């Protein structure tokens, strides 16, 4: 007996016909094709069938050869004739044709009715057990328990709302309508397409949600690999519409940072819809490598944390593209519970949220308060092209939670690039439109446009305090009547950059400021404000015309530079400049550097500020060695003492402290601030014609003596001189030098020796400078207000030497001497009259002459 031939083509016949049918025949009914294109598709389809038929004929000939060689011809003929007479052969042909038409194995082939009444669960189970692709035709197919999906399942329907799979009213609690067979370790290679899953939650009564874990969703995929879900509608769900999760019926809570074993992965959800759900429409847990695109989730049954799309505990590497949500608590919520790892590395490429409470809500529960541990997993969300339309909470979700366009809590590494928020009813959202809060950090909001939120407190608010956000970049924002404060930064926020903010506030209810920050150290630039009373309010100070603030190392208009400290700057300079320490800078200079804090070099070259609080201006080759040293227009010079200033000099080196020096190649003058002394190498001249030397004297009677009177001494005080008395001087207004003013303190403020010399003590300043300081007098009261002699009526400037204007009578002659009568000069033997400048008149009672007093 010959060996029975292997009929490989017969074994694959059903699968091949299905593939050909799926690929070619439906195009004949595609109205987007022209008639010529339709005909070409059909002809190509028939040609492919012909190829398969030829191969089948070749294998059938092998069968016939085997039958004939082994003498089985009579048996085969007899069997075929009996099948034909009994109708079995005809039924077989009809069944094959029907299954081909229904795209694989139809559930009706296995007895399904699809009449909305009959329990079709066994038909589904048998069809799936056949191993062939299963087709669900038009109809409502009732099932009394969940449908299990083994590996390598293909289940395709006649379309959403055409092919409906629905729970019967008799189904109890805990069942999911459709789920993979092995809920612990999972299955693989599952394809679901084109039907509706109706959870019939109404059978359980009003307000019923899931009993716990991942049970009671319309579609549950647990621990599966390679799952494609397309054109599925999930309605009236007890828990979720579609749930992608790890193995097991209960969601694991293993602590932050610990993901569950057996994740689902390589999941594709496309063009699906969820509505009437009790928790979330489409959700993921502890799974990875998931794509969700072109889906619509809307109008949940309940008002708890019911989100259109929820990427939950332990989910990672998830991409959501061009989806839409409506009427949910969260349009997209990316989150985790406190004892589970947060969803991370999530990408959103386009989403439209319509009338959700919080269109985009990113949070890690249990990690928001200042006393909570910092989340280790809430990281990496990138979202672009987000749209939020009329966010509101008319239904009272989450105990009347406040609406938001976007809320970020506890996450770090969040990038938003393109977010549009719009409302035509400003009363729907009256608090904050976009918030970064509750320990969120390292977030970037770029390309944000908000329109119509004219009753809201804040357009964008980085909430401060002990659990505030931090490290936030806000850029390229357009605010159209949105927020009394356009961008608001709370207290304690140390790292914020706000750039290119444009706001129109003339339609806002009581606008305050386009940008407002509690702290004084944000980075701010590029503000454009219309209709706001002030463009920027920083640390309580208003800047009506805008403000530019930068933090960190700063270099501008500079070809190249060396090291710049984070609190240093170099501007308008050429190569070789450094500002390597904090609070230092180099401006319009070359080859210059600051080496100590709080130092500045400007308009200089090859100079160095080595000490703290150094300043070098307009100098070449200048060096400031110690603190509080300065060189201004001083080249090739060195200031080596504390509080030392060199002005307009060349080639001098100074030591000592609290001094001002100048010179050329040597020191030519010095102001000693420590001791109040002035030194000059050459002549000291006056800048006017004043020509006498004077001292302060007190009048004997305490009254004013007018200018030009000759005075004498009595009891150490002055009065008008009389004839024959010793004239000491003249009351003068032209003294070039005046001594004894006691300008700064009471003359008895310090102790003096018997000769009037000051008694000193040696002290050391806080910066280490040693010097001699006058000993304070125990009789001196520093709390008393001191009035200098120049402001007291009893004290007078008396010219003692020089050319002084004197009151004269009619006897005085040029070239003669003078005497005094009642303080008025008369002809005598004292001094010399140089010139009579105002002749004597009886009306005035005196004249004026210039007298050389010596």
From Swiss-Prot:
* Binding of Mg(2+), residues: 285, 310, 312
As recorded in UniProt, coiled-coil segments are none
Cofactor(s) annotated in UniProt: Mg(2+)
User: Where in the chain is the site Cleavage?
Assistant: 691-692
Assigned keywords, A-Z:
ATP-binding, Degradation of host cell envelope components during virus entry, Host-virus interaction, Late protein, Magnesium, Metal-binding, Nucleotide-binding, Repeat, Viral attachment to host adhesion receptor, Viral attachment to host cell, Viral tail fiber protein, Viral tail protein, Virion, Virus entry into host cell
Q: Could you tell me where this protein is found in the cell? A: Virion
Q: Which residues bind ATP?
A: 746-795
Q: A Gene Ontology biological process annotation?
A: virion attachment to host cell
* Gene3D superfamilies with a match to the protein in the record: Head decoration protein D, Insect antifreeze protein, Single-stranded right-handed beta-helix, Pectin lyase-like, succinate dehydrogenase protein domain
Entry annotation: catalytic residues: 695 (nucleophile)
- The record's free-text note on cofactor binding: Binds 1 zinc ion per subunit.
One Pfam family this sequence matches: Pect-lyase_RHGA_epim
Q: What is the predominant subcellular site recorded for this chain?
A: virion
Question: Which Gene Ontology CC terms are recorded?
Answer: virus tail, fiber
- Transmembrane segment boundaries: none
Q: What is known of its domains?
A: The N-terminus has three domains that function to attach the appendages to the phage, digest the cell wall teichoic acids, and bind irreversibly to the host. The C-terminus is an autochaperone that aids trimerization.
| Assembly, per entry | Homotrimer. Each appendage is a homotrimer of gp12*.
Protein name (Swiss-Prot/TrEMBL): Pre-neck appendage protein
In its UniProt entry, the species of origin is given as: Bacillus phage phi29 (Bacteriophage phi-29)
Organism ancestry:
Viruses, Duplodnaviria, Heunggongvirae, Uroviricota, Caudoviricetes
